[in-house]
From Swiss-Prot:
Biological process (GO), any one: cytoplasmic translation
SUPFAM superfamilies for the chain: Nucleic acid-binding proteins, Translation proteins SH3-like domain
Oligomeric and partner information: Part of the 50S ribosomal subunit. Forms a bridge to the 30S subunit in the 70S ribosome.
Basic residues biased stretches: 34-54, 270-282
PANTHER family: LARGE RIBOSOMAL SUBUNIT PROTEIN UL2M, RIBOSOMAL PROTEIN L2
Protein name: Large ribosomal subunit protein uL2
NCBIfam families: rplB_bact
Entry's family note: Belongs to the universal ribosomal protein uL2 family.
């Protein structure tokens, strides 16, 4: 993937970059492998806004991705590399030898015509899915399960990858893109390689209208609001927030407050991610 720039015919065009989509080989998805997406506008079943800054955007169909890779031993040929509007990574259409078709996330190095496999005794090559116990230490992986058979839950963003660090006592230690080292059972499956569309994080939107195409509405600062709308609002001119600690519109402390409260899975974290480091591998 490469980024495409435009002539500076406007301030938006000057700063905008887009993916060149050179790797895409098929324009329309397999209809049987899609389903409709109903937009929520950030509202729940009662019509109340539960997630702000969501609404509008281009109409989409959801692509059904094979997260489990459970067709062990059945060869699959890569028929196409497609765009998926619901995620940053590209997706690959697989045609299995028994006639079934499935989508997977497309890793770097997988091209149309390649044959992919899943199972315990398959080759270590990009796109193949194996139990972690059969993967050599130091191998770059993605699409990692957190429980055997649950389907991939970790390392699914474009350009991301993890690394198998150690195996001990039925568990494997995997370094995640955030720098965190986490334990998973060795029977969990993972896919070999780094996910494609590597430069996705470097794309510059360029203009507000493009965010609206993506279904992202404006984010208004609390400081710019009236006191009735936000604790930071009001005052004459550009006055401060008036609070000893930044708060949300509902008065809860924000910015720097710890949000993780899942002690049940703390035992699986070997090394915490480093604060302020989003991805240490790029």
């Amino acid at each position: 993937m490469a980024l495409k720039e435009y002539k500076p015919t406007s301030p938006a065009r000057r700063h905008m970059t887009v993916a060149d989509f050179a790797e895409i080989t098929k324009a329309k998805p397999e209809k049987r492998l899609t389903k409709p997406v109903r937009k929520s506008g950030g509202r729940n079943a009662h019509g109340k806004v539960t997630t702000r800054h969501i609404g509008g955007g281009h109409k989409r169909r959801y692509r059904l991705i094979d997260w489990r890779r459970d067709k062990d031993g059945v060869p699959a040929k890569v028929a196409a590399i497609e765009y998926d509007p619901n995620r940053t990574a590209r997706i690959a259409l697989l045609h299995y030898l028994d006639g079934e078709k499935r989508y997977i996330l497309a890793p770097v190095g997988v091209a149309v015509g390649d044959t992919l496999l899943s199972g315990a005794d398959v080759d270590i090559r990009p796109g193949n899915a194996l139990p972690v116990r059969t993967i050599p230490l130091g191998t770059v992986i993605h699409n990692v399960e957190t429980a055997p058979g649950s389907g991939a839950k970790m390392i699914r963003t474009a350009g991301s990858f993890g690394q198998l660090m150690a195996k001990e006592g039925g568990y494997a230690q995997i370094r995640l893109p955030s720098g965190e080292v986490r334990k998973v059972l060795q029977d969990c499956k993972a896919t070999i390689g780094q996910l494609g569309n590597v430069e996705s994080s470097s794309v510059r939107v360029g203009k507000a209208g493009k965010s609206r195409w993506l279904g992202i509405r404006p984010t208004v600062r609390g400081l710019a609001m009236n006191p009735v709308d936000h604790p930071h609002g009001g005052g004459e001119g550009k006055s401060g927030q008036g609070n000893p600690h930044p708060v949300s519109p509902w008065g809860q402390k924000t910015k720097g407050l710890k949000t993780r409260n899942n002690r049940r899975t703390d035992k699986f974290i070997v090394t915490r991610r480093r604060p302020g480091v989003r991805n240490t591998q790029r």
